[in-house]
Amino acid sequence: TYEAVWQVTNMGLGQSMCIGIGGDPVHGMTQQQAVQFFTEDPNTDAFIMIGEIGGSEEEEAAEWIKNNCKKPVAAFIAGATAPKGRRMGHAGAIVAGGKGTAAAKQEALREAGIVVAKTPAQMGAALAEAMKNKGM
């Protein structure tokens, strides 16, 4: 999150808000609720969604964005190099049965028209591309 804020700031853009939804077991809102908030916020022109392997929240948020959001959106999914079936990270995210993989999440995001950064270092560039694609 701090990396995304730093990159956006270095692009000369500000932030209306930064939301950390927390780990898998306990969090204050879903990815979909967060993107809905930013979509409806008049002080937000574009946003970056950061997710991780495990679960299906990013795919659900991507579907919501596809059907409801006209703002530029970029995304990054952490955990692309995580071994299948192994718990990873602070939330103990696990990829099992083909669900929750970084590749599946990235594909769902791309299908929703979201520009996906391959690495954390590319989040700002992905947002710039998303904004350019929307004529900003």
Language-model segments: residues:
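Catalytic-core regions of core metabolic enzymes
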Residues: 1-136
